[in-house]
Amino acid sequence: GIGVAQDAVRIEGHAIEVRVNAEDPRADFRPSPGRVTGWGPPEGEGVRVDSAMREGDPIPPFYDSMVAKLIVRGRDRSDAIERSLRAIRDFRIEGVRTTLPLAAFVVGHPDFRDNRVTTRWLEDAGLPRFLKE
């Protein structure tokens, strides 16, 4: 065991993680290799960015396309969603296409806000709606 009784565990807050990939969600998630010509990760309370990427770094076509993980914590789900949307919109990556526009669409969508998404939601409903915008 982990040495902690279940009744001693307290849930505090809510967190959302967004994996930022150098891919084009409008082109069947095709990789977007190139050079990062602008890099400005978001900041703020509850916002963390895990990445080794910097301005001028290359994104080769041969490896995993993930360039960053954005982790946002809020007081509750609603607060985490609002902070996540702000962080996604403030995240500046230039020179390559990324999945950030799709992340903003998903996190801001009423189905996500109301916790009505499933493992099939993006493929069946979310992506078709995103592509129409």
Model-found features: residue ranges?
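Catalytic cores of soluble metabolic enzymes centered on carboxylation/carboxyl-transfer
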Residues: 1-133
